[in-house]
């Protein structure tokens, strides 16, 4: 259930604008069903945003901050779970699957992880970055100035020796030019850009 904490009264209130709602059924605007599992809630320019998964598709949804309305903004990419992370910048959202193909038993060299840009005004989507290879995921994306930084995480296990192969590469995507480049392959597990 989507709840609001009133700082002044310290009361927790369901985010539902229905006057007679008892907040105990699926008709309540504050109810988030299982299609929203694992999806963090984001607040951007007066609206709430969340990702739901329906019919094998991750969908970006905008919710009025008082809970009075919901609207689908964009179909992001195929997904069977709610492991989609979002970064907002300049009235767009950049979405990626933070689990990807990491540690997948059947991951292949042709598997691809992507970052998809969705324009919040019209829902238009475009793939702005892709990385191909087995056992990879995109992690820790953050916006710094005019660039989106993120990690490519490779995580696999050798079935015969049972040894793990874990490494990270830092990339950046330039919002203005639409180009991405490798910043470091020195196995960086966390970062900050100043």
Region spans (language model):
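Surface-exposed loop/turn elements that mediate protein-protein interactions on large endomembrane-trafficking
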Residues: 2-27, 56-77, 103-132, 157-187
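Generic beta-strand structural signal
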Residues: 5-7, 43, 53, 65, ...
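Repeated scaffold domains used in trafficking and secretory/extracellular systems
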Residues: 25-43, 78-90, 133-145, 185-194
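Alpha-helix-centered segments that form part of catalytic cores
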Residues: 44-45, 49-53, 167
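Extracellular, repeat-based ectodomains that mediate carbohydrate processing or recognition
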Residues: 84, 89, 98-99, 113, ...
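C-terminal regulatory/effector modules of DNA-binding transcriptional regulators
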Residues: 95, 141-142, 150, 167-169, ...
């Amino acid at each position: 259930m989507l709840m609001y904490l009133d700082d002044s009264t310290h009361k927790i209130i369901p985010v539902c604008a229905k006057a007679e709602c008892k907040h105990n059924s699926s008709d309540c605007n504050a109810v988030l069903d299982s299609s929203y599992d694992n999806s963090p809630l984001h607040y951007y320019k007066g609206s709430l945003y969340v990702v739901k998964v329906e019919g094998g598709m991750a969908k970006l949804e905008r919710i009025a901050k008082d809970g009075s309305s919901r609207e689908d903004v964009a179909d992001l990419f195929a997904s069977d779970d709610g492991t989609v992370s979002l970064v907002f910048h300049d009235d767009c959202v950049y979405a990626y699957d933070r689990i990807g193909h990491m540690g997948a038993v059947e991951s292949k060299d042709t598997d691809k992880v992507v970052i998809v840009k969705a324009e919040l005004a019209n829902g238009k989507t475009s793939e702005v970055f892709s990385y191909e290879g087995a056992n990879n995921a995109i992690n820790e994306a953050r916006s710094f100035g005019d660039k989106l930084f993120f990690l490519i995480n490779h995580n696999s296990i050798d079935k015969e020796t049972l040894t793990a192969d874990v490494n990270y590469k830092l990339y950046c995507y330039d919002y203005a030019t639409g180009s991405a480049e490798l910043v470091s392959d020195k196995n960086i597990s966390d970062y900050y850009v100043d």
